[in-house]
Amino acid sequence: YNIWDKLNLSEKIAYDYAQGTNDVLWDRHSNNGAPGGVMQRIVNRNDQLNTQTQLSYINSFGLHNIDALLGFETQDTEYAFNYMAGQDYPGDLYELTNAGSTSAETNRQSYRMTSFLGRANYNYADRYYLGLSYRTDGSSRLARENRWGSFWSVSGAWRFIDESFLNPVKNVLTDGKLRVSYGVNGTQPSDYYAYMNLYKYGIIYN
């Protein structure tokens, strides 16, 4: 959406949903089957919602070119796992409701990440470049007192092929650019709840 002249606002929302069910049966006649047969059912579900809000400004003043952006992003992810098993079936109708004994296990994990970011790029005559970026990320995978982290970078580049002293070799060297950058980045734990003390319990019915 064009707010004013070279100033634009964009909003993107993406939602992904996936679910899969896997049934495994060892009947009474298979090598791994119990006398009454065994049936397992595994159901996996993944939900992910991403939002991205960006305010961008792109403009040129003679040989000066500016590209700036401010953004806000969120990512919400939920994973659910359900496992059910039945055995000691009286006949060949292998449904969990017909099992002589059953067991079940369930697991659910959720994760959220929120980000504020900004960047600015400047170049003069498409020859000399300067770039700055900064972002702050908050992740639910980290303890509350360490949940937020800030990361930044600065870069510069020189397209030397456009310099006049290289005119004699431009028929051989078609492009050339030097770029340097420095910054700070980070990664988050792969475990959703590594910072917490977790307890596991189970109930078995016969």
Indicate residue ranges for each PLM-predicted region.
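Extracellular/periplasmic, surface-exposed regions of secreted and cell-surface proteins
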Residues: 1-26, 35-206
